Amino acid sequence: MADEGEVSALVCDNGSGMVKAGFAGDDAPRAVFPSIVGRPRHTGVMVGMGQKDSYVGDEAQSKRGILTLRYPIEHGIVTNWDDMEKIWHHTFFNELRVAPEEHPVLLTEAPLNPKANREKMTQIMFETFNVPAMYVAIQAVLSLYASGRTTGIVLDSGDGVTHTVPIYEGYALPHAILRLDLAGRDLTDYLMKILMERGYSFTTTAEREIVRDIKEKLCYVALDFEQEMATALSSSALEKTYELPDGQMITIGNERFRCPEVLFNPNMIGMEAVGIHDTTFNSIMKCDVDIRKDLYNNIVLSGGTTMFPGIADRMSKEITALAPSAMKIKVVAPPERKYSVWIGGSILASLSTFQQMWIAKSEYDESGPSIVHRKCF
């Protein structure tokens, strides 16, 4: 691979909510679009309209009023491979406009994913898209690359899955990786539910997208939940309005911080799990006592669900309460954290030392899909 330097690798971060794709060496992804495949709910009556039987990404999003939207990736695991293939096809041919058989491809996945998921990804890349080489990297590890560190604990929370990955001197510590199947999509669902209590009904897959937008624009994390609830009760200072696509205005008050509070208290949605602060703490406690100090000092946030205002301060406060009293706690929230997994992938795929790590097509042909477990972390 290394001798033909002009062929740049493709980096594709397939999130549960958004696909981020582009070329290795770039500082930002060229294509960012929702991981959605939409199918018409109604039959076409006008001949010659060029109706398609499925739409992907932004096109599905813009026609969502007449479509049923499906996300093929749930909780970081691909649940519908036909739709996933459509998304990759759209990524390569429509968004990046490249021939995948000419470029090595770096894909990402959540840690503690089923092995079969990774094998199937490998198989589709080599057999359907005929890529010359590929690699599957762990998302959180890439985020740490992007932040310029080699040691730290990454709390990566996207649309489908949240995980904490402690990394020391470049090595991920697999025994201490924890995963929480609670992320942005669950928050959107919870916001849909609590908005219903206010009398606003959102039910279809298209309306869920509106609620996701409300969440992204208006929600924030309270530093002190009880106190914030009291403030919201006594005054309307925290109320904000949002204009729906049809021009109707809705008012949202304590829902603004009740929604992301679920991250710190999953019991609110009936999940028997501990919050992201406890998960991070537990992950650190599973590591060797000698390296904990370095981890406490480098808690790196990554992923779209860490974009809520106030999340870093709250995280810092909660971890400080759990950690030994004299411990120095530092929570790092890089401004580009929405894309830091992709940026890390771009850095990794363009390193000269990485070029011998690719799984080549010849190796795949010899060993089959299981090669991915031997060559990728």
Curated annotation (Swiss-Prot):
Its main location: cytoplasm. Its EC number is 3.6.4.-. It catalyses: ATP + H2O = ADP + phosphate + H(+). Keywords: ATP-binding, Cytoplasm, Cytoskeleton, Hydrolase, Nucleotide-binding. It is found in: Cytoplasm, Cytoskeleton. It is an enzyme of class 3 (hydrolase). Coiled coil: none annotated. Belongs to the actin family. This is Actin. It comes from Chlamydomonas reinhardtii (Chlamydomonas smithii). The lineage of its organism: Eukaryota, Viridiplantae, Chlorophyta, core chlorophytes, Chlorophyceae.
